[in-house]
Amino acid sequence: MRRSSGFGGQKGQGPSCSFTGCWCCRGDDVAESDDSPFAQCGYNIQEKHLGKLHRAASRGEVSKVECILSSGSADLDERDKKKRTALHLACANGHPEVVALLVDRGCQLDVFDNKNRTALLKAVQCQEEECATILLEHGADPDLPDVYGNTTLHYAIYNEDIPMTKKLLLHHANIESANKDELTPFLLAVHEQKQQMEDFLRKQKENLTAVKLESIHQVMSEYKENETPRNPQNSNPEGTSNKMACLGEGAAGAKVDEIPGNPVKRLFNKPSIDDSRPMSANEDFDFDTEEKATEPANGKRQNGMGIIESAPQEHTNNENI
């Protein structure tokens, strides 16, 4: 497993900073050449590469941003050469007033930069909670992963940012989302030895499990209540009355034969010797077989059974001789 190592800076900063409160003006080839997901928080920016809207947004110049948008001289969701929007730069540099303006103007919230990071993810990564809050309250998705598979929760955990983590969880961020190293936010905390975050997440998972169990119990209770059988005496009143009528007839002396479809009749109504109903050959054979145990020993029969039946008399005559 590749270790996702890196270094974080203070809020809104990396190792150094010389551009309006951010460390992002040292050249595009400095930190972004490091492929580690946690090697940098902000953007490396050269002003000459920015359009006027991006430049004003990255500096936090609210009135200038509004003027540019009102004049129609720039597209609200315009991208720079690294696919960043003005919203990305405002979030990374911590300008909530610009973020609010762009959102009110209807900008797209979940646009990806060249590393598949949304403006919300950049706000979380750079620990800009106010910017992140605006985006979350307007429906930004906290679970969209970047090229490393990390979501907003992974970066909040790595930064040991408990307030941001709480806010993300309140907006239903997925605590079980795994990155490309197969690390969930909790496993990332363990892997990076973030003990405070590990304890916090363990507590959150316990609370989440308790809530889930309570919901399951409630659902099961409602299911059992809906599936409880009604009183059998009332479940089929018509069928019950018919059964009672049959029982009443039996009590009044009705013959068993008179009850239609009576199973007792089917089981015990065997044909007798005096039965005048014509019998098939198979029925006659079955009858003889069943009755042989009850035939008298001296009874003569016109079939093979008669030979066995007359044997005792022949034996008696031999004794007399």
UniProtKB/Swiss-Prot annotation:
PANTHER family: ANKYRIN REPEAT DOMAIN 36-RELATED, ANKYRIN REPEAT DOMAIN-CONTAINING PROTEIN 26-RELATED
Keyword Transferase: no
Gene name of this polypeptide: ANKRD26P1
Chain positions of ANK repeats: 48-78, 82-111, 115-144, 148-177, 181-210
Keyword Lipoprotein: no
Entries under PROSITE patterns matching the protein: ANK_REP_REGION, ANK_REPEAT
One matching Pfam family: Ank
Span list, region Disordered: 222-242, 268-321
Key words, A-Z: ANK repeat, Repeat
Gene3D superfamilies per UniProt: Ankyrin repeat-containing domain (1.25.40.20)
UniProt-recorded name of the protein: Putative ankyrin repeat domain-containing protein 26-like protein
